[in-house]
């Protein structure tokens, strides 16, 4: 094409064939090197041939995701392709064409001619010649030098040196020309009398080269050493459409060649053999090749010329579009490894059986309906047959095969196998299998049968070492004889009520997983095992742990969310190797006695959400190796002990949602303490932590701390100080000594009243967990919220966060679906290989809008129930798997798409289009009186917590901030150590109002009989489990009020305190509490007053006292949340 023409058109768009019927648009076209571009105007009738004619090029090439190139046919309309592409991007789960989706489509089409769109979708004029970030150096180096050949005196000559491929050509002034083959020579630096020189020598001769520009020496040395030392060429991810010349000329004698993830093709049938070299077929010229990786290119047929490479040992042709294998493949006699996975094969030639040296053949993720007959004649160790259409295995008899991978096939309901030598069998994700009988496979060691419909599993135990049968319908397991060699048994997510008793007799069992069943007990002798190291039996119905009287080797015991009421006596003494114990969400009131006299290795202790009191504190402080303690949601009145300071390794302490009135001063003496959580207690002050050098997070929100008078000395490395929902305003001037540190500390102080948005109160909680990176971020701009989950990539989430914040500020009323797509388009180069889950929520006065793609989920509270409205895609179901396969993707053993990606719905991952799409879910919810709120969070919240748990937490706590924090506490109490982020929106109920009466109104306008029913109607208490006692004249000073628990109603609070009896007067006051018949679980509180005209002053004083005392007894935060209109 004409470069001058391209440069001239880049300044102003040109018009190419005015539209006839359809609307014209601008297209951006790139030069073949990708360095320049121009815009043209065209319509759907404009063809590639017409564009080529105008720009004097032979072809238009399309690139998606800055990855594969595709040459377009001459009669193709580029604009039509672009519109179809954008239409796919704007698709929603509903696939409905609405006015909003049309607007989103129009918006993204208007963005397509932006240079930033290059990373997603681009057209090139001619055949692309992109210079990628290459390890294959194609630069030609040329320098004026002085050279000396050999060791003779006075032989220095002026010359010009040219370095290209693996050669250095020396051109002297007398027109002598000599080429040096670098790969056959040793390269180093030599200190000569004339200066530093590049020395090249072999067995016969030595060359010294001194550069006139001395600083050039290092560049030439590096380049020469790269050429010299390796016969391995890595040209992967180079955006190659042709193989570079320096590879094909075989000067390097390349043995290992990596051409993965390019756009290489075989020579088209119409291409003449005299055409330029560079096709896959031309690799036969490189006779030295032993290993070739051509995976993830655009090969349509098996390159038959490769069968001429007599030294070839390994050939990888996976993730191409090959539909047949030629019989000539039998010529590759030395071939040991052949990977043909993720192609379009349905048969293999019988001649493959002649490859007697073949050790590995991978034909997974093709279209085989039966096992190719040639496999029965090969001496392979493993059959890799995952992702095909195989229904059964017909062939029986003795065979050498030992391992078979049959994942994601269509195997029949009853599975049997008669190949006796099998040692490893993988049947995962065959959704029709209900029965597996393999008692005849006496050599079977490892079996994977997860995610089937298994109701019956029978195995031989003679050689069995590992059994994985999670996510099935099993209530029993038959293994005969006793599996003496069994090491791992995983049976989670089944229907077991009791585990087999023979488990206790397995002498080598080290790992047992049986969570998410219906277990009522563990095997009686399970703790007598001397080999068992880990037991995971959480989310069951276990009521007790069997007694055991001798020490064992157990290191991990996870039993959260069961029905335990106690632990065995001497539990900690006879488990000396226990390092992690989780008994959260049980009914335990007291930990068993432990005096510290015996050695205890326990490092992680999680006892959240039980009935523990301060009586268990002496037990805990005797465990000197503890690093994490979680005692949240218990009944602790204090956490103090004289030995508390001996927990020198403690890093994380959670005391939230207890009854604490103070924190022990000795907590500041713990040298390793990093995180302290004590929210939702009754604390009135924060102790001195100035000397805690490691402490970076303190959460004392939702307490009774008076922030206006708080004298807080901040530790030097404090980053987060959360004082939300306390009284007063926190003033950092109270600790001026730490002024230099304040710029690093994030003080969080959000009053609930300030977080009011169209009748919703807002609660937010987030944590990095045990990770150093924050990969989940949240954005709020006015009435719009954004959630970004970058998976394991913190840079991606922060990049999207910055863009979304700035974009929302400029386009606050833009449709949230269009915003989501703009985030997709703005990822740029990072979006080619990386992606993120994004959810956007917009709150209106009368409706809620939610748009989401990825793993974020949301549930709405309506009529005392929580219902999922957007469910993030955690697992790949059958329908989604079919779509992925149609898009030429595959799924690995861990259900990761193309071996990397966790979800097929994300923004980003441009290079995997159309396997991964930004397809979104959209909900438009009309607000009414039945809707109570919304919970939004990342996927692990919904994976680990049940909808019932979340519903209970939401409806048993009136503060959305407390709800968010308790959800986070519960998540961490279940051993989740990753990032979490939670948003809670809660509808505000009408304020409780006490209508008192001024003197004038009492005397002149209102009578008590009229006022009393009015008070009854307006005062509604939204705390269902709280019952106020009757008022008595002189009650004692009350003890701390217990925190409200979601498991059982809290005991009633003590009587309202009063320091002196009320004055005797003609006014009488009575507080009556009666259950409301109109509100579910609510109570109506009425204050009945009888006034006389002579007691105005005393009645006002009495009213003020009653108001303050009632607010304090109700634990309202801040105390003046209840308003009194006097």
Swiss-Prot record:
It is an enzyme of class 3 (hydrolase). Residues 761-987 form the PPM-type phosphatase domain. SUPFAM superfamilies: L domain-like (SSF52058), PP2C-like (SSF81606), RNI-like (SSF52047). It catalyses: O-phospho-L-seryl-[protein] + H2O = L-seryl-[protein] + phosphate; O-phospho-L-threonyl-[protein] + H2O = L-threonyl-[protein] + phosphate. One of its GO terms (molecular function) is protein serine/threonine phosphatase activity. Its EC number is 3.1.3.16. It comes from the Eukaryota. LRR repeats lie at residues 56-79, 192-213, 227-250, 251-276, 286-309, 310-332, 333-355, 356-378, 380-403, 419-445, 451-476, 483-506, 507-529, 531-551, 552-574, 576-601, 623-646, 648-672, 674-692, 693-714, 716-743. Its cofactor is Mn(2+). GO terms for biological process: intracellular signal transduction. Residues 1049-1064 have a biased composition (Pro residues). Residues 1038-1077 are annotated as: Disordered. This is Protein phosphatase PHLPP-like protein. It comes from Caenorhabditis elegans. The lineage of its organism: Eukaryota, Metazoa, Ecdysozoa, Nematoda, Chromadorea.
């Amino acid at each position: 094409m004409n470069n001058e023409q391209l440069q001239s058109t880049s300044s102003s768009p040109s018009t190419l064939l005015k539209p006839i019927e359809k609307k014209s648009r601008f297209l951006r076209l790139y030069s073949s090197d990708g360095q320049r571009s121009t815009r043209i105007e065209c319509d759907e009738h404009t063809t590639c041939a017409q564009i080529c004619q105008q720009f004097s090029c032979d072809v238009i090439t399309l690139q998606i995701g800055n990855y594969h190139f595709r040459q377009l046919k001459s009669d193709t309309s580029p604009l039509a392709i672009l519109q179809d592409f954008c239409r796919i991007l704007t698709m929603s789960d509903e696939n409905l064409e609405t006015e909003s989706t049309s607007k989103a489509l129009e918006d993204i089409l208007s963005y397509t001619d932006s240079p930033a769109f290059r990373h997603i979708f681009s057209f090139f004029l001619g055949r692309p010649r992109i210079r990628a970030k290459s390890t294959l150096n194609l630069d030609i180096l040329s320098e004026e030098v002085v050279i000396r050949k050999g060791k003779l005196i006075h032989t220095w000559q002026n010359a010009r040196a040219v370095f290209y491929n693996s050669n250095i050509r020396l051109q002297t002034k007398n027109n002598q020309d000599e080429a040096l083959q670098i790969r056959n020579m040793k390269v180093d630096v030599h200190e000569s009398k004339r200066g530093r020189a590049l020395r090249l020598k072999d067995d016969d001769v030595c060359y010294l080269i001194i550069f006139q520009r001395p600083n050039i020496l290092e560049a030439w040395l590096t380049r020469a050493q790269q050429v010299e030392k390796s016969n391995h060429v890595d040209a992967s991810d180079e955006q190659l459409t042709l193989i570079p010349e320096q590879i094909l000329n075989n000067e390097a004698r390349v043995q290992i060649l990596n051409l993965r993830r390019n756009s290489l093709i075989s020579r088209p049938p119409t291409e003449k053999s005299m055409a330029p070299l560079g096709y896959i077929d031309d690799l036969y010229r490189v006779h030295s090749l032993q290993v070739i990786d051509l995976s993830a290119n655009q090969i349509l047929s098996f390159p038959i010329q490769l069968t001429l490479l007599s030294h070839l040992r390994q050939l990888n042709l996976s993730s191409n579009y090959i539909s047949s294998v030629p019989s000539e493949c039998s010529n590759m006699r030395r071939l040991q490894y052949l990977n043909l996975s993720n192609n379009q094969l349905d048969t293999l030639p019988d001649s493959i059986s002649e490859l007697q040296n073949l050790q590995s053949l991978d034909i997974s993720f093709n279209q085989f309906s039966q096992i190719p007959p040639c496999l029965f004649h090969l001496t392979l160790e493993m059959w890799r047959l995952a992702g095909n259409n195989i229904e059964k295995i017909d062939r029986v008899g003795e065979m050498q095969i030992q391992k078979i991978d049959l994942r994601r096939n269509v195997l029949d309901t009853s599975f049997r196998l008669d190949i006796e030598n099998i040692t490893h069998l993988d049947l995962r994700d065959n959704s029709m299998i209900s029965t597996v009988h393999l008692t005849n496979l006496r050599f079977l060691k490892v079996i994977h049968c997860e995610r089937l419909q298994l109701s019956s599993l029978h195995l031989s135990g003679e050689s069995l070492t590992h059994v994985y049968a999670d996510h099935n319908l099993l209530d029993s397991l038959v293994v005969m004889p006793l599996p003496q060699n069994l090491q791992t048994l995983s049976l989670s997510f089944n229907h077991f009520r009791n585990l087999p008793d023979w488990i206790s007799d397995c002498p080598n069992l080290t790992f047992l997983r049986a969570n998410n069943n219906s277990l009522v007990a563990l095997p009686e002798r399970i703790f007598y095992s001397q080999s068992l190291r880990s037991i995971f039996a959480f989310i069951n119905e276990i009521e007790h742990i069997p007694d055991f009287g001798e020490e064992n080797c157990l290191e991990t015991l996870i039993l959260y969310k069961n029905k335990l009421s106690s632990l065995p006596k001497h539990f900690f003494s006879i488990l000396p190797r226990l390092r992690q114990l989780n008994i959260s969400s049980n009914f335990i009131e007291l930990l068993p006695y432990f005096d510290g006299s015996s050695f205890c290795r326990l490092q992680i202790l999680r006892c959240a959400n039980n009935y523990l009191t301060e009586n268990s504190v002496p037990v805990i402080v005797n465990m000197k190796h503890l690093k994490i303690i979680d005692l949240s949601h218990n009944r602790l009145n204090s956490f103090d002990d004289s030995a508390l300071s001996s927990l020198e390794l403690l890093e994380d302490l959670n005391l939230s949602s207890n009854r604490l009135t103070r924190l022990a001063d000795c907590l500041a003496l713990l040298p390793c303490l990093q995180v302290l959580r004590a929210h939702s207690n009754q604390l009135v002050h924060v102790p001195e932590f100035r000397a805690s050098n490691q402490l970076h997070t303190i959460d004392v929100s939702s307490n009774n701390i008076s922030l206006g008078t708080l004298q807080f000395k901040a530790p030097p490395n404090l980053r987060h100080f959360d004082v939300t929902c306390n009284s007063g305003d926190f003033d950092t001037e109270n600790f001026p000594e730490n002024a230099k540190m304040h710029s690093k500390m994030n003080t969080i102080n959000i009053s609930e009243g300030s977080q009011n948005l169209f009748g919703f109160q807002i609660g937010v909680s987030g944590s990095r967990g045990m990770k150093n990176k924050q990969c989940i971020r949240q954005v709020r701009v006015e009435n719009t919220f954004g959630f970004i989950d970058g998976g394991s990539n913190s840079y991606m989430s922060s990049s999207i966060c910055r863009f979304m914040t700035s974009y929302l500020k400029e386009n606050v009323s833009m449709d949230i679906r269009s915003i989501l797509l703009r985030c997709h388009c703005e990822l740029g180069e990072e979006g080619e290989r990386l992606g993120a889950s994004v959810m956007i929520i917009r709150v209106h006065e009368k409706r809620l809008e939610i748009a989401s793609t990825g793993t974020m989920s949301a549930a709405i509270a309506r009529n005392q129930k929580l219902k999922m409205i957007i469910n993030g895609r955690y697992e790949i179901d059958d329908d989604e798997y079919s779509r992925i396969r149609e898009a030429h993707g595959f799924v690995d053993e861990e259900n990761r798409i193309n071996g990397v990606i966790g979800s097929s719905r994300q923004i980003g991952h441009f290079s995997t289009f159309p396997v991964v799409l930004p397809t979104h879910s959209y909900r438009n919810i009309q607000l009414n009186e039945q809707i109570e709120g919304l919970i939004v969070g990342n996927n692990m919240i919904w994976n680990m917590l049940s909808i019932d748990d979340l519903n209970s937490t939401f409806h048993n706590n009136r503060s959305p901030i407390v709800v968010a924090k308790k959800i986070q506490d519960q998540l961490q109490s279940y051993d989740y150590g990753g990032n979490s982020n939670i948003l809670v929106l809660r509808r505000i109920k009408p304020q409780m109002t006490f209508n008192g009466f001024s003197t004038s109104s009492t005397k002149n306008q209102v009578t008590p009989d009229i006022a009393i029913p009015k008070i009854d109607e307006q005062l509604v208490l939204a705390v269902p489990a709280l019952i106020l006692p009757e008022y008595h004249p002189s009650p004692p000073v009350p003890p701390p009020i217990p925190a409200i628990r979601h498991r059982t109603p809290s005991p009633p609070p003590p009587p309202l305190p009063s320091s002196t009896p009320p004055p005797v007067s003609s006014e009488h006051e009575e507080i009556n509490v009666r259950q409301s018949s109109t509100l579910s679980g609510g109570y109506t509180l009425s204050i009945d007053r009888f006034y006389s005209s002579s007691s105005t002053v005393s009645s006002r004083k009495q009213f003020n006292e009653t108001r303050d005392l009632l607010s304090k007894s109700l634990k309202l935060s801040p105390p003046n949340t209840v308003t009194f209109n006097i």
